[in-house]
Amino acid sequence: MEVVPIAYDSMGVRSMATFVKTADVSILIDPGVSLAPKRYRLPPHRIEIERMNQKWEEIKEMMKKAEVAIITHYHYDHHDPNEVEIFSGKKLLLKHPTEKINRSQKGRAAYFLEQLKSVDVEIDYCDGKSYEFGNTVVELSKPVFHGADSRLGFVVEVYVEDGKSSFLFSSDVEGPNNEEQLAFMLEKSAEVVFIDGPMTYMLGYRFSQKSFESSVENLKRLIAEDVKTLVLDHHLTRDLRWREKMQEVFKAGEEAGVKVESAAEFAGVKEELLEARRAELYKMDKN
């Protein structure tokens, strides 16, 4: 199995776009990319905008190679409703648009489905379902919280197994910070796990200390399973001090022989936390 992180926050954009290829099927999970409209009270820097445009082109190129696309929820860093032609001829597995969903995402889902009417695409609502493609099994969790509660809605986690190796994709759990989010991860016990991580850059503001501590403990529990590589990114890598704050997790990984890294490191590319460095980028313009 080949797992390719295309666009992630450690690569300079808000995204978790990931390409997964087995001998049986090629899948693109969450083909979307965006930027924080404001960070440090500043709009996106031109370097961020250029990177977003570059990453969107890369996502579209990889979408051409995919037979299946999965949308785990309807935030714009995980799907783009305005270029639906990329899904033409594909099988599209969608988080259910009207069940276990908040008002904001429900509206976005309805708009997305309306746009998809112009495209030849096979759509299925995938919450809690399992799909077989040859010897490859793709399984989706039941909807779990986007974060600590239902305010931001629900997401589905993704598990892919081809008889030789296994991969799990958390979507936006912001942790995992509760048992429901963790249960699917522990049940599947995948070898390679991609998790968006706790929202430490909002710690004490929109992300509580309790949720952070739960996330750390849950990640340590996951490390104690069969995982070989744990990728932490997205919400976590909006924080320049993310490694420092996750020291306990890195230590647990080291003791268990589990590699803990960002998506950029996994992909073998330079880590560039452009959003977290936005104020610095603007300052450089003045010098």
Curated annotation (Swiss-Prot):
This is UPF0282 protein AF_0504. HAMAP family: UPF0282. Belongs to the UPF0282 family. It comes from the Archaea. InterPro entries: RibonucZ/Hydroxyglut_hydro, UPF0173_UPF0282_UlaG_hydrolase, UPF0282_hydrls.
